[in-house]
Design a protein with these regions (language model features):
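Terminal targeting signals and extreme-terminal segments of soluble enzymes
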Residues: 1-136
């Protein structure tokens, strides 16, 4: 997987990378290691929730100008855990579903390397000052 400059210390800790980014959608990948697992040797739910939160929020932060950095905070999020994962690469996909100038709603899914659904979620996000929507 291609190395990227970390977006934050937390991103560096978890280890996800952006693999695809388009207006309204983003795809992340995470190569699982032992430190992502819980005591049952499955991916910890917090890791899955973090992947969903990041994919869903990043989906609404796209800008065609790479110099424009848009930021948002999570207002609410629901996560449903469907099946366990313990090895391989996870893929998280976030998609914007609606919103306005200051808030947007997204959904997301996490899949294992075999395409099995591991978790899904929905979230509402508020754009930070200076990050308001550039339009449709």
């Amino acid at each position: 997987m291609k190395q990227q400059q970390p977006y934050s210390g937390y991103q560096a800790l978890i280890g996800w990378v952006v693999t695809e980014r388009q207006p309204g959608t983003v795809t992340l990948a995470l190569e699982l290691t032992e430190h992502h697992l819980n005591l049952s040797d499955f991916v910890h739910g917090g890791v899955l929730a973090s992947l969903l939160d990041t994919a869903m929020s990043f989906a609404g932060l796209y800008s065609p100008d790479p110099k424009v950095v848009r930021k948002a905070v999570t207002l609410s999020m629901t996560t449903t855990f469907v099946s366990p994962a313990r090895e391989g690469t996870l893929t998280a996909i976030g998609r914007v579903r609606g919103g306005g100038r200051k808030t947007f709603m997204s959904s997301g899914e996490v899949f294992d390397a075999n395409g099995n659904l591991i978790a899904f979620g929905e979230g509402t996000f508020r754009l930070r000052s200076g990050s308001e929507s550039e339009g449709p």
